[in-house]
Amino acid sequence: MAEWISKTLGELTSFISKGIPPKYVDEENENTIRVLNQKCNRNFEISYNESRIHNAAVKKVPENKLLHSGDVLINSTGTGTAGRVAQIFNIPMPTTVDGHMILLRPTKEIEPLYYGYVIKSYQKKIESLAEGSTGQTEI
């Protein structure tokens, strides 16, 4: 029988970063990628409906900030939105997040779905870490 192995979340996270400061454009082309923002993160789910388009020809997006299936996203600013957690699996096009979101990526040692469940279970705690006033709260 296998024994349980105990590890910290930090040991099971391969990458953590805030998103990019995007250069938005109105129309998609071969040089654009999708940018998720806080409006895209609701009820533990990600929706592309409120996503915007970034011109990667003007400002290149680092490869490690392009989303991977299993990444966890946390809203980092705003009263009532800071601390919202969602995990993304369906990435239909090259996508990143803006600077109001935090990107966490699991290591290969953990099942991504389980990694997401663990972080989602701490959403209330993460929300309580937000500091600031007059609607400018930040994690």
Model segments located where?
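Non-catalytic DNA-recognition/assembly elements of restriction-modification systems
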Residues: 1-20
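A short glycine-rich beta-alpha junction/loop motif
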Residues: 2, 20, 94-102, 131-139
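A generic secondary-structure signal marking the coil-to-beta-strand transition
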Residues: 5, 31-34, 100
